[in-house]
Amino acid sequence: MPQKDPCQKQACEIQKCLQANNYLESKCQAVIQELRKCCARYPKGRSLVCSGFEKEEEEKLAMKSGSK
């Protein structure tokens, strides 16, 4: 049986917040930050819902190293 995603609860909270606020991310920064904190607690690849943040971080690092 697959393991439950450790950050699934936070991801669901983001969806609820976005739906309640007409998908305005600016209204949901607190819950987005909670998901980021959750993702930071687990090794890369452990949480499927964190994969978007992981990709975002990789892109930021690639841009930084390319601008030197």
UniProtKB/Swiss-Prot annotation:
GO terms for cellular component: mitochondrion. A motif (Cx9C motif 1) lies at residues 7-17. Keywords: Disulfide bond, Mitochondrion. The keyword ATP-binding does not apply. Disulfide bonds join 7-38, 17-28, 39-50. It is found in: Mitochondrion. InterPro entries: CMC4 (IPR027179), Cys_alpha_HP_mot_SF (IPR009069). A motif (Cx9C motif 2) lies at residues 28-38. Its main location: mitochondrion. Expressed in many tissues. Signal peptide: none annotated. PROSITE patterns: CHCH. Residues 4-46 form the CHCH domain. The twin Cx9C motifs are involved in the recognition by the mitochondrial disulfide relay system. Belongs to the CMC4 family. PANTHER family: CX9C MOTIF-CONTAINING PROTEIN 4 (PTHR15590:SF0). This is Cx9C motif-containing protein 4.
